[in-house]
Amino acid sequence: MAGLMKLACLVLACMIVAGPITSNAALSCGTVSGYVAPCIGYLTQNGPLPRGCCTGVTNLNNMARTTPDRQQACRCLVGAANSFPTLNAARAAGLPKACGVNIPYKISKSTNCNSVR
């Protein structure tokens, strides 16, 4: 039950963060949150890396093909990262590599998403 509450908070935080952002991106923070939701235990509780997490990271990377989409995904991930005080920063930064995915930015609480291309 606590995990569902955290997921609900994550989705809400992403929507609040992305609400005022105007862009041509097709990705919403709700979509991004759905892709990375299976990663929450890995990123906050030092749990094992679930297959569903890597599937979500791969699918998100495949959807974020344009610069606006990559910037929007980045903003959503930064917003989500900031909503979890127990986020393991090293695991978040290393998540793409752990899943065999190459993304053009570091997942962290302080990533400048405007510089993402």
Curated annotation (Swiss-Prot):
State whether keyword Disulfide bond applies.
yes
Q: Among its keywords, does the record have Isomerase? A: no
Concerning CDD domains, the annotation shows: nsLTP1
Annotated SMART domains:
AAI (SM00499)
Keywords attached to this entry: Disulfide bond, Lipid-binding, Signal, Transport
Q: Which SUPFAM superfamilies match?
A: Bifunctional inhibitor/lipid-transfer protein/seed storage 2S albumin (SSF47699)
What Gene3D superfamilies does the database record attribute to this sequence? Plant lipid-transfer and hydrophobic proteins
Ranges that cross the membrane:
none
Gene Ontology terms, MF aspect: lipid binding
Pfam families from the xrefs?
Tryp_alpha_amyl
Task: Classify the source by domain of life.
Answer: Eukaryota
Provide the disulphide bond pattern: 29-76, 39-53, 54-99, 74-113
Task: Please name the InterPro entries in this protein's record.
Answer: Bifun_inhib/LTP/seed_sf (IPR036312), Bifunc_inhib/LTP/seed_store (IPR016140), Plant_nsLTP (IPR000528)
Q: Where is the signal peptide?
A: 1-25
State the Gene Ontology BP annotations.
Answer: lipid transport
* Free-text function comment from the UniProt entry: Plant non-specific lipid-transfer proteins transfer phospholipids as well as galactolipids across membranes. May play a role in wax or cutin deposition in the cell walls of expanding epidermal cells and certain secretory tissues.
Q: Which family does it belong to?
A: Belongs to the plant LTP family.
Give the protein's recorded name.
Non-specific lipid-transfer protein 2
